Swiss-Prot record:
Residues annotated for GTP binding in this entry: 38, 89, 120, 181, 283-285
Species, as recorded: Rhodococcus opacus (strain B4)
Lineage of producing organism: Bacteria, Bacillati, Actinomycetota, Actinomycetes, Mycobacteriales
The protein, known as: GTP 3',8-cyclase
Pathway(s): Cofactor biosynthesis; molybdopterin biosynthesis
Annotated positions binding [4Fe-4S] cluster 1: 45, 49, 52
Binding site for [4Fe-4S] cluster 2: 278, 281, 295
Length: 351
């Protein structure tokens, strides 16, 4: 058992499968099945959002510790064909920081045809790569965007890059990377502009989802008494729009949806803290260093990279992955007494 850098939790090379049923898919002890794979491919980012990264950025992961494009393609292949994963999303950091992203997408598209390949991005620089990514096989993008006011955006991200983001969003739409969703983190600093952001999304024809801020900030300054809840947001949006509760599009979807002014447009709210959906979670996460993380808030990761580079075959890697998910917690525990946030920030884990 070894410990690695950046405050990463204990990394194990084996796990207990005691009591696990003899099935191929990624089932856990609470009956949940992981079908949605999030693959973080870098810790680097072109922005410095206050809730995600410190101003100086995250410590660089040594190049030899990062999964290569071919290694990621192989693990995605295993996840789909041996473990039952049905959707793959590439995250960061910022995925566009990888110069081999198109190669990675193309390799996955060839190995797992028909499986949706999505990406969460800040869209900085996307205008130059949207067409190539679409040709490689990328299906759609979610864009992280907390404000459409340039000055406010610069304060939140510590970078004046809103024009590039807007150009990237338009380029993605032209390239057919749809349906596109905008993700915005709920904070006191973003609440006043929430209605303006929704207005902009309605005009642009993209779906907006607000996400309650979780204790995953790099500076570890999150405090429950300062967080903006889903109920508070609904009250603010209700001053400008008529919102009608619409529920979830499927039980495992994290966002509760509301019709806006009678529909068909909707706005989603992911109330990760106040309305936890852990009991329906269907996600499994692969970090940029090649470890499986069963939950954003897990204190352990299972090392696939070492096994992969030591000659493990596909079934051996799949079995390690199954063990990681079998031991997934019942929930994130944010509301429990004695909760301790993970040392990894969201930027280091991958969204």
């Amino acid at each position: 058992m070894t410990t690695v850098e950046m405050g990463i939790p204990t990394v194990r090379r084996s796990v207990s499968l005691a009591g696990r049923p003899d099935v191929d898919h990624l089932v856990d002890r609470f009956g949940r099945v992981a079908r949605d794979l999030r693959v973080s491919i870098t810790e680097k980012c072109s922005l410095r959002c206050t809730y995600c990264m410190p101003e100086e950025g995250l410590p660089a992961i040594p190049a030899q510790n990062l999964l290569t494009a071919s290694e990621i393609v192989r693990l995605v292949d295993i996840a789909v064909h041996r473990l039952g994963v049905r959707e793959v999303r590439f995250t960061g950091g910022e995925p566009l920081m990888r110069v081999d992203l198109e190669q990675m997408i193309a390799g996955c598209a060839e190995r797992v045809p028909g499986v949706p390949l999505a990406m969460t991005t800040n869209a900085v620089g996307l205008e130059h790569r949207a067409d190539g990514l679409a040709r490689a096989g990328l299906t759609r993008v979610n864009v992280s965007l907390d404000s459409v006011d340039r000055e406010h955006f610069a304060r939140l991200t510590r970078r004046d890059r809103l024009p590039s983001v807007m150009a990237g969003i338009r380029a993605a739409a032209r390239a057919g990377l749809a349906p596109m969703k905008i993700n915005a983190v709920l904070m006191p600093e973003t609440l006043s502009g929430a209605a303006d952001l929704l207005e902009w999304c309605l005009r642009e024809g993209v779906t907006l989802r607000f996400i309650e801020e979780m204790p995953l900030d790099a500076d570890h300054e999150w405090a429950r008494e300062n967080m903006v809840t889903a109920d508070r947001l609904l009250a603010v949006l209700g001053e400008r729009f008529t919102l009608t509760e619409h529920g979830r599009e499927d039980p495992s979807a994290p966002a509760e949806e509301w019709l806006v002014d009678g529909g068909p447009a909707t706005v989603g709210i992911i109330a990760s803290v106040t309305r936890s959906f852990c009991s329906d979670c269907d996600r499994t996460r692969l970090t940029a260093e090649g470890t499986v993380r069963s939950c954003l808030f897990s204190d352990q990761e299972i090392d696939l990279r070492s096994a992969l580079r030591s000659g493990a075959d596909d079934e051996e890697l799949a079995q390690l992955w199954r063990g990681a998910m079998w031991n997934k917690w019942a929930g994130h525990g944010i509301n429990a007494d004695g909760f301790a946030p993970p040392q990894r920030s969201m930027g280091a884990i991958g969204g």
